[in-house]
């Protein structure tokens, strides 16, 4: 039995209706949810949360007005709204909203981040989210599962992002639509485990879940990953599945580095970057985006924030930052960006004429020092 089958209480391929333990949305998706909700329902179920993280603080009058409408709706419904404290997926974990949960849905494609807790967490559209907010339940077709079993220990400069770029690339030619990725024998810390499940959707998976004991039963594909031989990786434009060892693109000139997001904006990941930047000066625009206010607070308390500022980096308020290309570090025409986010589609971070490479915080920080993509082994 796969983890998904266990959590949904049904066999692969079956269609079931299940109660949802947590439903959440953010400032980018709530306006459409409100429209759909008002056409069909009157009261929101109690286990509903809203986060302002995508474009906050509001950079335009239009966005400010949309956020005002969300606040008015939330006030009518008694929905908690968490503003400017960080990214929804990170805060859901920090606040314990999914503790003891089995099923979580969110109006964001990276809701599977919470799969690091061992729950079935999926992103759904605005209309489906409105239904869950009104009924407290929804339907699922139990997905098939692909297992990823780690072996060995990663090298000192290899992070979860490197593993995921490798995995996404390895699965590129396998039909992953509506399949779950289940991870076993995971040697990474909890901060890094969240990166694994967060990145899963970029393989076109339905969700990602971390399990404890691997049964080997019921999986449509089994993928073994030897971390001891895995080099630092980078995903070339314009897809996360364009993964290659960093050394293959070493020397590529870059204009900006972004370290953060729901993928790599946790304390441990920013700390790794700070260790590299300590006492140095960045050669290109370097933006740091803590995933939550708690992460930012800890950066200040430990002196990491000062290290980064002294190195010439800019620290953003907690949130999504430039990942979605709407504010605080948008890519211009011809810009080459090295980012620790999860997507590098054409135009994702701004101009469709820019290029985005994806890498780990270690690779990104080192590259920021040299102004070009640099392998950790070559520059550490």
UniProtKB/Swiss-Prot annotation:
Its cofactor is [4Fe-4S] cluster. It comes from the Archaea. GO terms for biological process: L-leucine biosynthetic process. Pfam families: Aconitase. InterPro entries: Acnase/IPM_dHydase_lsu_aba_1/3, Acoase/IPM_deHydtase_lsu_aba, Aconitase_4Fe-4S_BS, Aconitase_4Fe-4S_dom, HAcnase/IPMdehydase_lsu_prok, IPM_dehydratase_rel_enz. Heterodimer of LeuC and LeuD. Catalyzes the isomerization between 2-isopropylmalate and 3-isopropylmalate, via the formation of 2-isopropylmaleate. This is 3-isopropylmalate dehydratase large subunit. It comes from Thermococcus kodakarensis (strain ATCC BAA-918 / JCM 12380 / KOD1). The gene is leuC.
